[in-house]
Amino acid sequence: MPVKIAQVEKCFKSAGPQPNGLQASADGLWCIDQRNNRLYRQDFATGEVLFDAQTDTVHSSGVTVGGGYVWVASTYERKIAQLEIDSGKTVAKYSSPGSGVVGWREGAADAQETGAHGLEWRDGRLYVASPPSQMVHVIDPEGWRETHCFRVPGLRVHGIAWAGDGNLWAADTSAGTVSLLDPHSGRIFDVIRVQAPDEVHGMTIHEGVLWYCSAANCDIGRLLLY
């Protein structure tokens, strides 16, 4: 099979110093920053900040919108925060599924437990990508119950995004790959490479094109295939 290498199109810089989660919506591009923990919404064309709010999350690594709320992965708190969509204020916090020590820190004396990264929403369920468990966990927010989980490829799963065919894109930041997965079995249908030094941290999809952000250099851009 041919190797698919994404052409990285850098669109604009993030509003915050370390963007780590991304979610496309009808009214703009949501971004959560892992350093200042601020929640932004930016214009797709210009990067203009349309919304800006301080959250009480900790070293956040994922964001999505669903059920009338914004959801943020508060990674170092090992929580998923449910926020008011018009203010960024916390409504509730829930235990982050799959929390633990990431594989590359296993056995280290100073290893710290952390939580989720990428988030997505579909059909009333929250999809939670967890680097410690190397899985995507499917959560029913009513009662905060895990209904399913499936393994994802790679060492460090990060952003996730729904493809138009109902499958799920998942980024592995350590390997520089984005894989297309069956959201029930985890079976891999396709793989895209993203060449260094570019890194995919947060990821989403808008008008059929994958968008990414990188905490390493504040880039927000698109992953194009020709």
Question: What is each model feature region?
Answer:
Residues 14-26, 56-66, 97-123, 153-165, ...:
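Beta-rich, blade/repeat-based domains predominating
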Residues 43-47, 84-88, 140-144, 182-186, ...:
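Short loop/turn segments that connect beta-strands within beta-propeller blades
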Residues 1-5:
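Blade/loop signatures of beta-propeller domains
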Residues 15, 31-36, 72-77, 128-133, ...:
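Conserved beta-strand positions in repeat-built beta-propeller and related beta-rich domains
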Residues 198-226:
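Blade-level signature of beta-propeller repeat domains, shared across WD40, Kelch, NHL, RCC1
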Residues 7-13, 48-53, 89-94, 98-109, ...:
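A short beta-strand motif characteristic of beta-propeller blades
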